[in-house]
Amino acid sequence: MYRIAMEKLLKWKESKRRKPLIIEGARQVGKTWLMKEFGRLYYTDTVYINFDSNSRMAELFASDLDTERLIMGVELYSGRKIDPDHTLLIFDEVQEVPRALSSLKYFYENAPEYHIVCAGSLLGIALHEGTSFPVGKVDFLKLFPLSFKEFLMAAGKERYAELLSKQDYPMITSFKQTYIDALKQYYFVGGMPEAVQSFAENKDFNEVREIQKRILAAYEQDFSKHAPNEIVPKIRMLWNSIPSQLARENKKFVYGLVREGARAKDYETAILWLSDCGLVHKISRVNAGGIPLKAYEDLKAFKLFLVDVGLLGCMAGLRQRTLLDGNDLFVEFKGALTEQYVCQQLKTIEDLGVYYYTNDRGSCEIDFIVDTGEQVIPVEVKAETNLRAKSLKTYQEKFTPEIAVRTSMADFKKEDRLVNLPLYAVEQIAEL
């Protein structure tokens, strides 16, 4: 299964300023597979350590963090010689042994020749729990579920993914039905690697749903296992409210939908926990269109999206038959699925700040507004081919952005500074 992140790993390997690498991401987005596959493809040997199931290695890191001593201990455990130039050293579930995280500082300072990649499903939480963390001594890589282009490649449609990257929109339009059909499948299957692999091999939607149910059950178990006891009920209520939050026309998060009378201060910690786990994307409001957008962030107003569109459909009980009814998929629960999909694709784009906009009166709302570092692009999301976008026009008149995007099921079209970008090509937004 091809992952675009593999190219980033290869650049890391070849960098002269390489530091130990930490891969962040939710459980079951493919971190372990990616690290092992990277070692298989680009190294002579790979030594894999899972700190969640290896007490001996936990003991090794419990005392002296001298790098020569640690390497010797790993060699004795694995029975293999670690060659700095040709061996990839993988630390998995590294959050389980905080001193293993701390050791990365010493590897960077005293033994930078070693190639070390780390990951942990709950790493974000560990970083907020007082763990001694090697600030400035490590590189980071965020891994998300498969994007739509990665889904196309996994489903045997590599040339279609390549065509999107080339942005040959006249040719893309000629094959738009293939893209639309694949997009409907992606809305159901999502991008969790196990679900995508199953679909690619068997085309069985029922099997995909069972996999998604197991993933959701595993997340629920994580709530009980890893979250502080006092916030577990709040995490569950908040998590289960997300489909109904997104089903509303105004998708701003409302605490009252979690529990009647709920207030922000009661659930802030639960939101932070889910965000640190990588299970939700918190998209904050901005009230202006200047660079950098973060300067205009309103931390009190936000939308919450799930990590994956397929999991959202599973939680909402979206049925397989919806896929067979023409464009009905984009009518039933259309706003939620479409905005979730767009958010998910935008989050996979490196160094892209993602927000949403409303003016202070609430009379103008832009579904997403993104900061590329060079320009701010407002993004209006339409589930079907309806191209009316009153708010987008109002925003353009006020802030005169270089380009504005309306993404829908309609074909690519550019008129002055307004671009209609097909939903299946939204990953290309930073390349416009």
What are these regions (language model features)?
Residues 2-16:
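Pre-Walker A adenine-sensing motif
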Residues 31:
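Conserved lysine of the Walker
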Residues 34, 38:
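Hydrophobic positions on the alpha1 helix immediately C-terminal to the Walker A/P-loop
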Residues 53-85:
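Short glycine-rich substrate-engagement loop in P-loop NTPases that contacts/grips substrate
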Residues 90, 115-121, 142:
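Structural recognition of the conserved hydrophobic beta-strand(s) that form the central parallel beta-sheet
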Residues 128-247:
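Interdomain motor-coupling "hinge/lid" segment immediately C-terminal to the ATP-binding subdomain
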Residues 200-365, 369-370:
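Accessory nucleic acid-recognition modules appended to NTPase machines
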Residues 346, 366-385, 404:
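Conserved catalytic cores of phosphodiester-cleaving nucleases, focusing on short active-site segments
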